[in-house]
From Swiss-Prot:
SUPFAM superfamilies: TorD-like. This is Chaperone protein TorD. It comes from the Bacteria. One of its GO terms (biological process) is protein complex oligomerization. Keywords: Chaperone, Cytoplasm. Involved in the biogenesis of TorA. Acts on TorA before the insertion of the molybdenum cofactor and, as a result, probably favors a conformation of the apoenzyme that is competent for acquiring the cofactor. It comes from Aliivibrio fischeri (strain MJ11) (Vibrio fischeri). It is found in: Cytoplasm. One of its GO terms (cellular component) is cytoplasm. The gene is torD. Its main location: cytoplasm. Belongs to the TorD/DmsD family. TorD subfamily. HAMAP family: TorD.
Amino acid sequence: MNELTAFNEQRAEIYWWLSSLLSAELTTEQLEQYGSFEVRTFLSNLAETPELSDSVNALIEKLNAVQGREDAQLELSADFCDAFLGSDKSSALPYASMYLDKSGLLNAKPAQDMREWLTKYNIAQKAEFNEPADHIAIELDFLGNLIVMTNQQASEDEFEAYMNAQLTFINEQLLSWTPRFNEICIERDKFGFYAAVTGLLVTFLKLDVKFLAGE
């Protein structure tokens, strides 16, 4: 494994991690893991990247605050519901269609576009996650898989084509709406844990675009 493929694996893991945070409420066991040495080391290492430092430290601060709550898991689950599962008037709905399609309806063209990406690269949506294809967690899971597929390409030309596909996907399917998604999450997530997650997501996406574009 060379340096670039190893870096790609790290990128995929970060996208999968963010996907898991935005797909469902954290269980008690998962929340306890966020206090572990392994996870805290992962976050500290991530914060060593200057462009990510503020966003990661904001998340660490909220994690520390979560663990000081009396009923941490239940309260954080309520935060997740308030942040993402309400109406478009009260929550930051995690679907591209809500931000990119004038109809304001779920399962609009952005969801169809996402289904086409899944089909093109033969990546299946997880059967147990019964959401429209343009849910943020599905898009991030797809991106992690696309990165891993990039490392499996036999030729330099194919590898480059897959790297370019990642860049196109991030610009068209993610950065086209996640900044606004983050803004609304900041407004509506009163405790701020999930706003810190979406803030880190947008910061990481912007940094990743620079990497993929060779800047």
